[in-house]
Structures are given as structure tokens and as C-alpha cells.
Amino acid sequence: MEEDRLVFETSKGVEPIASFAEMGIKDDLLRGVYQYGFEKPSAIQQRAVLPIISGRDVIAQAQSGTGKTSMIALTVCQIVDTKSSEVQALILSPTRELAAQTEKVILAIGDYINVQAHACIGGKSVGEDIRKLEHGVQVVSGTPGRVCDMIKRRTLRTRGIKLLILDESDEMLSRGFKDQIYDVYRYLPPELQVVLISATLPNEILEITSKFMTDPVRILVKRDELTLEGIKQFFVAVEKEEWKFDTLCDLYDTLTITQAVIFCNTKRKVDWLTSKMRENNFTVSSMHGDMPQKERDAIMAEFRGGTTRVLITTDVWARGLDVQQVSLVINYDLPNNRELYIHRIGRSGRFGRKGVAINFVKSDDIKILRDIEQYYSTQIDEMPMNVADLI
């Protein structure tokens, strides 16, 4: 398998841009990005946004979990002209879920610029697609089969399309979409910008890039930016949900030795836990996606500056942030999917900080915990009594 993977280097001259504000994107789009909960661009966003919004063809080798979907959303929203109701950007994805997720992120990030996007996917009514497309959208995110069908019916008009994005291209090819991708491409205007994103680059992908692209910028983003190395991971078995709170109170003195982040799965749980901790005279701060950006910025600044030591939050925080001085993370709730686990407790290898993660686990969570262990080939042991000495 490995022989057909080329050694892939990032093109010379691709400089990472450390903040969204320096990317030259529209102010209202920047508002949408912050509102969505991003604070700092991920590695792929730092490298790919600028070449794409300046009109270059781009090949990005990146896996899921690198922030590629929001990178796509950001660039598409920057490029389209929302005053025109023509389709200007087309994104093809291998699965309905990914296409729908991409549409959601575009609508969320593009909220203040009033972008219109629609997911053209199998399993939804063709009538709905026709209605939406005739009403006018600037962006279509879809699966190759349905998009091809809509183009052939002349419902999806292609003359205004200036950007084609092929997401998870290797996955599209392995699902047998090659012919449909070529079919769609044939209908698109000749002056087309093409962006291809793929975790692997087999020869079939390189064939697409040589046929569809001119002098592409190459960007390689390894997912190993986040690592569990150097992080001691433990679990505490709690019989009932109510017992988690007592366990947390017992651990509070340990938490405040350093700074700690406590993750809950819902905003309601964050609010509930924060007020319950305060009722019991514990000092904590909290943050989640429903708070106004100003308030979130203030809370983050306090936490970064060390004025507050314990932060209770949802996954909004996990995705876009890198507070390296946090050496203790508590999963009050285990994350809903295993990718989020590394976003919550992983460290970027560059800093190589040591850390401790403690997972509160009810008996019905054991299976999820084992699944996480297996997925990351890591070991999560029962928490020892002297956990304070490890921090």
C-alpha cells in the first residue's frame, strides 16, 4: 500500500498565519468565526486559507480532526459574492453526513454575511433541492451522485461556479465516485479554481490533480500535532451521576495546585455545575458557546493570565484553543465521540507539556472508555490516591 504514496512536502513560501484577524477576511465573516467558537486557526487553517482566498489551486493532505471543514467554510464564505444568487462554490464530499455538516458550518460561520448554502444529498427529496436551488444559493455542498443529477436536470446551474472543493477525495474514490466527479467537472466553467483535500494521496488522486489543476500549492498537515504522550490518564469509577459532584469536590484542592479545565457535554450541565460549585464555596469560572463573544474573551483572558484557576466548559473550548499551562483536565462527562477526547486532553507536541487527565466514568461509560483506549492505543488506569503528586 505504501509505495504509491508520494513523499509530500508543503510548497515553499507557504507561511502559517497565526491569527484569523491577519488573514484579510471580511469583518462580518471574522465575527462569524469568533461567534462559532474559534479563537486561533488550526494548522491547516493557518496554511491553506490564504492561498485559497487568493485564487490558487490547492492540494491539502489533511485528515479529519484537523479543522478542515471550518477551513472550507471560511474560504468559501470569503470568496462568494452574497449579492449574487448564483451558485459560485461547489463542495463534493463522500458521505451525506459530511456534506450536511459542511453546509451547517458554512451557514454558522457565514451567518453575518448572510450566505445561502444548500446540501444536495441523496436520501432527501429532489423537490426540496429544486426549490432551494431555484430560490438561489451561493454555495452547494453535496455528494457526487446527487450533484451530478441536479446538474443534468439543469436545476443546478454551473455557469457562475468559480471554486470546486473535493473533500476527503481518497474516500470519494474508494466509494466509486470517480466517474461522477469527472462528470461534474466537465460541466464547470474553464476558469475554475480547484481545491483538493485528502488524507492519503494514491495515484488516482494525483491523476485528478494533474487533470484539474494548474500549478497547485501543496500543503501537508499531519494530525500528530496533538499527542497523548506525556499525559497520564486516569479514570474514577462513579456509580451514579450524582456522585460525580462529590468526587469533584474531593479533588478541588488538587485542582487548584495548578490550572484545571473541566469538560461537560452540554451547556446546561456547565451552568448547573458552575452554580453548584459556587453554592459550595468553590471558586470556578465557566464558558460555553451561548455566551457573547466579549464575555468569552474576558473569561479566557482571566484564565490565560492565571487569575482564575478552574474553568468549566463545553467542547467549544477544546477545538480552537491551546492553553499550554493547563496541566489537569477533568472529563466530568466522557466526550460524545472519541476524536474529541484528544482535542480535550491532547497536547501539541511542540510544547510537549506533561499533564494529567481524569475521566469520571459511570458503569455504562466503561465501554466508551475502552473504545477510546483502543482507538488511541493508550492506557487509562484507575486514579491512584496520590494523584496530587503527579501534577
From Swiss-Prot:
Residues 49-219 form the Helicase ATP-binding domain. Keywords: ATP-binding, Helicase, Hydrolase, Initiation factor, Nucleotide-binding, Protein biosynthesis, RNA-binding. InterPro entries: DEAD/DEAH_box_helicase_dom, Helicase_ATP-bd, Helicase_C-like, P-loop_NTPase, RNA_helicase_DEAD_Q_motif. SUPFAM superfamilies: P-loop containing nucleoside triphosphate hydrolases. GO terms for molecular function: ATP binding; ATP hydrolysis activity; RNA binding; RNA helicase activity; translation initiation factor activity. A motif (DEAD box) lies at residues 167-170. Its EC number is 3.6.4.13. Coiled coil: none annotated. ATP binds at residues 62-69. A motif (Q motif) lies at residues 18-46. Residues 230-391 form the Helicase C-terminal domain. It catalyses: ATP + H2O = ADP + phosphate + H(+). It is an enzyme of class 3 (hydrolase). eIF4F is a multi-subunit complex, the composition of which varies with external and internal environmental conditions. It is composed of at least EIF4A, EIF4E and EIF4G. ATP-dependent RNA helicase which is a subunit of the eIF4F complex involved in cap recognition and is required for mRNA binding to ribosome. In the current model of translation initiation, eIF4A unwinds RNA secondary structures in the 5'-UTR of mRNAs which is necessary to allow efficient binding of the small ribosomal subunit, and subsequent scanning for the initiator codon. Belongs to the DEAD box helicase family. eIF4A subfamily. This is Eukaryotic initiation factor 4A-3. It comes from Nicotiana plumbaginifolia. The lineage of its organism: Eukaryota, Viridiplantae, Streptophyta, Embryophyta, Tracheophyta.
